[in-house]
């Protein structure tokens, strides 16, 4: 029975690495997965999912207006798809998360989503909010703070390494802009 999974974490926990390993596992069994990633995240090239350890794969892009159910149904008509893998799923809209539930429930294809739970202000992303609500399985991937505790928050920094306390929810960046920390160090960095 197909299910929808949400693998979430702070940055640098290996979400993309885990996604790429899952894709490889399906391919190794002669099955056909399809990978999607957010069009707005082009840090490693357009239409690519890349991990910090050097793994990479081609991906279909989703934009704010992409109907994922229609896209996946069309791909599945051409060639049976055994799994849908979605990177940067925090950027999905409520409607797109619903469309992915339809992929699971009507097309009977498992959907594995990988993304951040919260932004640099500790607020849920829209996609993450509805994945937390509607996914069949929730899996937290763990990373560590500089103090050794579990990191579950993300700090956005300026060019001098100072924590930023306001701004747009989405600002694409990697280790140069974001630091994963525990809640205590998050509060200290923001002066809370």
UniProtKB/Swiss-Prot annotation:
Q: Principal localization?
A: cytoplasm
| Family statement drawn from the similarity comment of this UniProt entry | Belongs to the thymidine kinase family.
Q: Where found?
A: Cytoplasm
Instruction: Report the record's Gene Ontology biological process terms.
Output: DNA biosynthetic process; thymidine metabolic process
Q: Which domain of life is it from?
A: Bacteria
* Protein name per the record: Thymidine kinase
Residues binding ATP are 9-16, 87-90
Q: Which Pfam families match?
A: TK
Binding residues for Zn(2+), per the UniProt record?
Answer: 145, 147, 182, 185
The subunit structure is: Homotetramer.
Where in the sequence is the active site? 88
PROSITE patterns according to UniProt: TK_CELLULAR_TYPE
Q: What is its EC number?
A: 2.7.1.21
Keyword terms, alphabetized = ATP-binding, Cytoplasm, DNA synthesis, Kinase, Metal-binding, Nucleotide-binding, Transferase, Zinc
Upper taxonomic lineage: Bacteria, Pseudomonadati, Pseudomonadota, Gammaproteobacteria, Vibrionales
Task: Give the top-level enzyme category.
Answer: transferase
Q: List the HAMAP family hit by this protein, alphabetically.
A: Thymidine_kinase
């Amino acid at each position: 029975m197909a299910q929808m999974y949400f693998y979430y974490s702070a940055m640098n926990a290996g979400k993309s690495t885990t996604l790429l390993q899952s894709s490889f596992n399906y391919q190794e069994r002669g099955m056909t997965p399809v990978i999607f990633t957010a069009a707005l995240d082009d840090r490693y090239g357009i239409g690519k999912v890349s991990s910090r350890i050097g793994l990479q794969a081609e991906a279909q892009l989703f934009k704010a207006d992409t109907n994922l159910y229609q896209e996946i149904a069309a791909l599945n008509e051409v060639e049976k798809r055994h799994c849908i893998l979605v990177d940067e799923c925090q950027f999905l809209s409520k409607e797109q998360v619903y469309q992915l539930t339809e992929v699971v429930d009507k097309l009977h294809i498992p959907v594995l989503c990988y993304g951040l739970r919260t932004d640099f202000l500790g607020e849920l992303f829209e996609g993450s909010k509805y994945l937390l609500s509607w996914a069949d399985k929730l899996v937290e991937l763990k990373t560590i703070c500089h103090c050794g505790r579990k990191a579950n928050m993300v700090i956005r920094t300026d060019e001098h390494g100072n924590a930023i306390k306001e701004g747009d929810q989405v600002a694409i960046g990697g280790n140069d802009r974001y630091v994963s920390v525990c809640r205590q160090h998050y509060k200290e960095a923001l002066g809370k």
